[in-house]
Amino acid sequence: MKHNTPFPIRLGLLLLAMMASVVLHAQGGQFPFPSVPSTLRTPEDRLQYLGIHYWDRFDFRSQSLLADKDVTEQGFVNFIDLLSRMDSLTAARSADAFVTKAFAQKQSADTFTSLSHHYLENPQSPLRNDAVYVVLLRSMRRRKGLTPTQRQGLDYKIRTFGSNLPGQRAADFQFVDRRGKHHRLSDYRHERVLLFFYDPDCDNCHRI
């Protein structure tokens, strides 16, 4: 599944649903948001409910719905934005609820695997968020019936995207200074180091 359209913009409907006592109903061409109970008063409780029940009204078996970018793709964009606002436990529970439903059918699984890659793995995505991606990957890894190859692939991605997250100790690696001399980050344990990361194939980057 290719995504050639511009990245959708995150909407404010989710925060509205968390903060106000509103009921969001499914309408034609709109994502079928869950109804957040008015008895849930705090933003934390509303956020938790919305995350876990976000996909309750979505029909993962509908091919036409899966192909509707205004509904499915934008709904997924809003969901990953929602995950980024949660504590780790709530995010994991919400991701588990999503994966259980989304990966029960092959077409749905293929659609959301592609969307996850497009928005959370693509370096050009303004929504790229390794921490959120790892939450989803771990939920995918907990699924039953995975082949050894699928497990290995998910394990590799979890290790890769789970490294050097905010708040973690940076993994040791080699870098080259402006004179072409090679160093390791561990050589500067008690010093501050300013590193410039760039694409080796980017000609303009080499000129900076």
Go through the PLM ranges and name each one.
Residues Q27-D172, D177-R178:
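Oxidative protein folding and maturation machinery
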Residues K2-N4, L120, K181:
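Short amphipathic alpha-helical segments with coiled-coil-like heptad repeat character
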Residues F7, L15, R61-L66, V176, ...:
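A generic structural micro-environment signature
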Residues H183-H206:
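Short active-site neighborhood of thiol/selenol oxidoreductases, capturing the structured segment around
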Residues M1-Q30:
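Bacterial Sec-dependent N-terminal signal peptides
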